[in-house]
Amino acid sequence: MAVPFRRTSKAKKRKRRTHVKLQLPGMNECSNCGEYRLSHHVCPECGQYDGKDVANS
């Protein structure tokens, strides 16, 4: 099995891993109360989705 001839430096390793990161969830402002909520989810603060009261009915 092949073995690296030279050790990979910290800089080289970190430059390679710049694209390895966590993705932030897609957040939107609620059109009713202005709080941030996940896309395509009911607002946890006011219970509305797509302009309709869903959670409190």
Swiss-Prot record:
SUPFAM superfamilies: Zn-binding ribosomal proteins. Coiled coil: none annotated. It comes from the Bacteria. GO terms for cellular component: cytosolic large ribosomal subunit. Keywords: Ribonucleoprotein, Ribosomal protein. The keyword Ribosomal protein applies. Belongs to the bacterial ribosomal protein bL32 family. HAMAP family: Ribosomal_bL32 (MF_00340). This is Large ribosomal subunit protein bL32B. It comes from Listeria monocytogenes serovar 1/2a (strain ATCC BAA-679 / EGD-e). The gene is rpmF2.
